Curated annotation (Swiss-Prot):
<keyword id="KW-0812">Transmembrane</keyword>
<feature type="transmembrane region" description="Helical">
    <location>
        <begin position="246"/>
        <end position="266"/>
    </location>
</feature>
<dbReference type="GO" id="GO:0008137">
    <property type="term" value="F:NADH dehydrogenase (ubiquinone) activity"/>
</dbReference>
<comment type="similarity">
    <text>Belongs to the complex I subunit 2 family.</text>
</comment>
<dbReference type="GO" id="GO:0048038">
    <property type="term" value="F:quinone binding"/>
</dbReference>
<comment type="function">
    <text>NDH-1 shuttles electrons from NADH, via FMN and iron-sulfur (Fe-S) centers, to quinones in the respiratory chain. The immediate electron acceptor for the enzyme in this species is believed to be a menaquinone. Couples the redox reaction to proton translocation (for every two electrons transferred, four hydrogen ions are translocated across the cytoplasmic membrane), and thus conserves the redox energy in a proton gradient.</text>
</comment>
<keyword id="KW-0874">Quinone</keyword>
<feature type="transmembrane region" description="Helical">
    <location>
        <begin position="368"/>
        <end position="388"/>
    </location>
</feature>
<keyword id="KW-0813">Transport</keyword>
<feature type="transmembrane region" description="Helical">
    <location>
        <begin position="341"/>
        <end position="361"/>
    </location>
</feature>
<dbReference type="GO" id="GO:0005886">
    <property type="term" value="C:plasma membrane"/>
</dbReference>
<feature type="transmembrane region" description="Helical">
    <location>
        <begin position="487"/>
        <end position="507"/>
    </location>
</feature>
<keyword id="KW-1278">Translocase</keyword>
<feature type="transmembrane region" description="Helical">
    <location>
        <begin position="26"/>
        <end position="46"/>
    </location>
</feature>
<feature type="transmembrane region" description="Helical">
    <location>
        <begin position="90"/>
        <end position="110"/>
    </location>
</feature>
<dbReference type="GO" id="GO:0042773">
    <property type="term" value="P:ATP synthesis coupled electron transport"/>
</dbReference>
<dbReference type="InterPro" id="IPR001750">
    <property type="entry name" value="ND/Mrp_TM"/>
</dbReference>
Length: 525
């Protein structure tokens, strides 16, 4: 018998043990992957009229089912799938938050009464703007029902992103959540050129940031000999290791994650994409993507690089200050309501980084609570924007909102309340969210950072109040926009978002207790 045959015989005699996978602990993600595949089959084989009903129901049922699975896992705390996925308090809290925001976003996407031709999304992203096909597409009643499985795929990537305990798995999750969004951004029914430009910019810059992230993964492996977050943490500070690889890994991973949260100076995609994307997709990105990206950022910095927090804290300080200043100052110059809200999102990313700069349990709790408060408010705000329309689509220019408080006082009053919440006025969720992160920063000896945040909050309040003054203290335009009163789903979304903004402002303790429990349990590794 030859040597090769002997080796093969010995290998065949050995029992290969497959990895143990707790499928029940992965059920939220598995449910969504299954629903997304079912959505693809529905779109391929169901008739058009049936698709319009089945797809939103299927997506909504999937999000509800995944949320129930998250609730049932509340007591779980384990690393599974060969160390690739971590189920712990922060993971489950953030996954539940993402699913709630995704369900609200589905209501906006499913709305067909806003536009005379149908929903906010069209049936094809590749039609040349200004062409005969583009004109026909704008007035066609066809609905892009593929948007629903794309959304479900993206949300499943978000759930995996916040649960990843392995940098390569985190990269895969990043691509799963990002690729559907690139396409969804280009599906706006109106202003096709702006929408396609947004999709292209988001794709190119997103691919660029993903390359940075992947390069950071390579350096982490070169330093620690592993891409598992726990093993990277064990290698930090080890004698004889090449710290150059460690710092390069931290910097490159940070660039990739700062891009996803829209932090300066990696925020340049945010205003263009928020403005050009269909407003339901903008709301979905503004809330869901920010939660997922911050969840991954917190896990990477707290788990893998927690042992060198004194090295990365100054970087967080600098990025937080730059992000708050850029977001607040540039929002002052905007004349488009969606671009203004985009720069507001940049500023809020800076406020979230203030809590992270505390690098303590209070910072983790404050950041998670802030993400919930911000998400409800911003989804409701973009839903209001979609209701104010002209004959050419949404009235996004600020001058068109002049006198809206006199023609539609209820809607204008709701929008004013949401803007005040974003500004952080007491008795709103914005105030309690900022209080939570600022308190954590002070406890973590970052008081100067809180002072800068308060100054930027005052600057930000100016452009919020400017819109309120324009709506209530200006004469309405003769040919001004109208408020569409038929969209039941959109009004329901506005109502839910505004109600949660109020409840989390006057009675935040139940959610704070939930965030405290999740943060105290900590990250597993």
């Amino acid at each position: 018998m030859s040597a090769a045959t002997t080796v093969l015989a010995q290998g065949a005699a050995q029992k290969i043990t497959p990895p143990s996978i707790e499928y029940s602990s992965l059920s939220p993600m598995l449910i969504l992957f299954g629903v997304a595949l079912a959505g693809v089959l529905v779109d391929a084989f169901a008739p058009p009229k049936a698709r319009r009903v089945l797809q939103p129901l299927l997506a909504g049922a999937g999000f509800i089912g995944a949320f129930v699975a998250v609730v049932l896992l509340h007591a779980h705390r384990q690393v599974l799938a060969a160390g690739a996925v971590a189920i712990d308090g922060p993971t489950l809290f953030l996954q539940g938050t993402i699913l709630v925001f995704a369900l609200l976003s589905v209501l906006l996407v499913a709305e067909r009464r806003l536009d005379s031709s149908g929903g906010a999304l069209v049936a094809s992203a590749a039609v040349v703007p200004g062409s005969r096909g583009s004109t026909a597409q704008r007035t066609s009643p066809d609905v892009q029902t593929e948007a629903y499985p794309l959304m479900v795929f993206s949300v499943s990537g978000m759930l995996l992103f916040v649960a990843s305990n392995n940098l390569l798995v985190m990269f895969v999750a990043l691509e799963i959540l990002s690729l559907p969004l690139y396409l969804l951004c280009g599906l706006a029914r109106r202003r096709r050129l702006l929408s396609q430009e947004a999709a292209m910019k988001y794709f190119l810059l997103g691919a660029f940031s993903s390359a940075f992230f992947l390069y950071g993964v390579a350096f982490a492996y070169g330093y620690a000999g592993s891409v598992e977050l726990g093993r990277v943490a064990d290698a930090v500070g080890t004698v004889g290791q090449n710290d150059t690889y460690l710092y390069l890994s931290l910097a490159l991973l940070g660039v990739g994650l700062f891009f996803k949260i829209g932090a300066a100076p990696f925020h340049s995609w945010t205003p263009d994409v928020y403005q050009g994307a269909p407003t339901p997709i903008t709301a979905f990105m503004a809330a869901g993507t920010k939660v997922a990206a911050f969840g991954a950022l917190l896990r990477v910095f707290y788990v893998a690089f927690g042992g060198m927090r004194w090295d990365w804290r100054p970087v967080i300080w600098a990025v937080a200050i730059l992000t708050m200043v850029v977001g607040a100052v540039l929002a002052l110059t905007q004349r488009d309501i969606k671009r203004m809200l985009a720069y507001s999102a940049v500023a809020h990313a800076g406020f979230l980084l203030v809590g992270m700069a505390g690098s303590n349990i209070d910072g983790l709790r404050g950041a998670m609570f802030y993400l919930v408060t911000y998400g409800f408010t911003t989804i409701a705000a973009f839903a209001v924007v979609s209701l104010v329309r002209t004959g050419d689509g949404e009235a996004s220019d600020l001058s068109q909102w002049q006198g809206l408080g006199r023609t539609s006082p209820l809607l204008a009053g709701t929008f004013a309340f949401l803007l005040l919440a974003l500004a952080g006025i007491p008795l709103t969720s914005g105030f309690t969210g900022k209080f939570a992160v600022f308190q954590a920063a002070i406890a973590g000896d970052a008081t100067p950072l809180v002072v800068v945040a308060l100054v930027c909050s005052a600057i930000a309040a100016f452009f919020y109040v400017r819109v309120i003054v324009l709506m209530f203290f200006s004469e309405p335009l003769a040919d001004g926009p109208v408020v569409v009163t038929r969209p039941t789903l959109t009004f329901a979304t506005v109502g839910i978002g505004a109600l949660m903004t109020l409840l989390l402002g006057v009675a935040p303790q139940p959610l704070l207790d939930l965030a405290t429990t999740a943060a105290t349990s900590g990250f597993v590794r």
